Each structure stands twice: as structure tokens, then as C-alpha cells.
Design a protein with these regions (language model features):
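Short amphipathic alpha-helix
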Residues: 17-28
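Short hydrophobic "strand-cap" motifs at the C-terminus of beta-strands
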Residues: 7-8, 133, 155, 182-184
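Active-site helix-initiating loop/hinge in glycosyltransferases
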Residues: 16, 188-197
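A structural motif in glycosyltransferase catalytic domains
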Residues: 20-21, 180, 194-196
């Protein structure tokens, strides 16, 4: 094995999967492997195009002795390209939200989620190793036909989480009131209304 390459549906700042692939790339490189991140060109944030490559234009980068890790999270052209790439294959499943949560709210997102779930089923038997970032997700991808998924918890850069708090912001919330912090996207499946109730 000379390289461990990762494939993601999109690459951005502040996104959990993008953050994880950055940490994993640094880890793979520290172990002595070449490692690149690939995505669809249109789904790579323009200012990050130096960090990630367009998969469709870079298929020649892959060799039979490489490991190719697909982060499976939504419908994408990269999911269709993955099985045809040379190299040993692995999938890390991050969950694909049921599209029903987005029907009538964000139809384009619902379509991508539906496509992703269909692609996840079609990818069964395409990888030697299948992982998921939680037991729930492992059970879900197993139900889609993937054999023996293992749990690999989210890989984090803990140094980034040790930032000093902003004293100005802390003062704003020292008013004796109860404060609730929601960390996540405001999206139908996150059920923020349950938190507010």
C-alpha cells in the first residue's frame, strides 16, 4: 500500500465529515502514506480547491495497491465512481437521513438523500471493509446489505476543541437565565422544536 485516499460527497469548512477527513489525512500522512481527498469539483468549496481534488478528473491518481476510503453520507456522483476505481476499497458510513424529513421543505436535498440511500444499497459488496461512525449507523448499513460493518467513532482533532472561551460571549450569558446550546444544522431531522418544547 502506497496511499490511503479518501472520497467525500462535498468538502467544506465547519462540516463534520470534512473536518474528519482532514484529521484522517494528517494521520495517514504521519504514518508515511500519501493521502489525498477527492470530491465532486462543484461540491468543493472554492477556497478549499487546493486541499481537495476533483475525483472525475483525477481517476488516474489511484493504483491497485492503494486503499480507497469512501465517506458515505448523501447521494453523489462520487458514489457511482467509487466501485470502478483501482485499489482496495473501504466505506465509512456516516448516515443518510431518510428523505421524508425533507419532502415539502427542501426537495433538492430530499432527492440527494433518496439517491444516496439507493447508492448505499447498490454499493453492498463493493468494499472489503465497511465501517460506520456509530452502532446505529452500523445497523442501518447492515440492513442495506453490507456485511459485518464495524464501528469507527468520529475521528476528531481534540486540539481544536480546547480553544479558550471568548470572555465577551460568556458575559452575555451570565444573566441568571437557563441557556440551551444547540450544536447542529437547523434541519427537519434535527428536531430542534423538541429542544424548544
Amino acid at each position: 500500500m502506497r496511499a490511503i485516499h479518501q472520497i467525500v460527497a462535498g468538502y467544506a469548512n465547519g462540516d463534520a465529515i470534512s473536518n474528519e477527513v482532514r484529521v484522517m489525512r494528517a494521520l495517514f500522512r504521519s504514518w508515511g502514506y500519501a493521502s489525498q481527498i477527492y470530491s465532486e469539483q462543484k461540491r468543493i468549496l472554492p477556497e478549499l480547491r487546493g486541499e481537495a481534488r476533483d475525483l472525475a478528473a483525477s481517476r488516474g491518481d489511484f493504483r491497485p495497491e492503494d486503499v480507497v476510503l469512501l465517506h458515505l453520507s448523501i447521494g453523489s456522483d462520487v458514489n457511482d465512481l467509487f466501485p470502478g476505481l483501482p485499489g482496495r476499497k473501504a466505506i465509512l458510513y456516516h448516515n443518510i437521513t431518510p428523505p421524508e424529513y425533507f419532502r415539502g421543505v427542501q426537495e433538492q436535498t430530499a432527492s440527494l438523500l433518496d439517491r444516496g440511500r439507493r447508492q448505499a444499497k447498490a454499493l453492498a459488496d463493493s468494499a472489503e471493509v465497511v465501517m460506520a461512525d456509530s452502532r446505529f449507523n452500523a445497523e442501518e448499513i447492515a440492513a442495506m446489505g453490507h456485511a459485518n460493518p464495524q464501528v469507527l467513532p468520529l475521528v476528531l482533532d481534540f486540539a481544536m476543541l480546547r480553544a479558550k472561551p471568548d470572555r465577551r460571549i460568556l458575559r452575555q450569558y451570565r444573566d441568571g437565565m437557563a441557556n440551551i446550546l444547540f450544536v447542529g444544522r437547523c434541519a427537519p431531522n434535527k428536531k430542534i422544536e423538541d429542544l424548544l418544547n
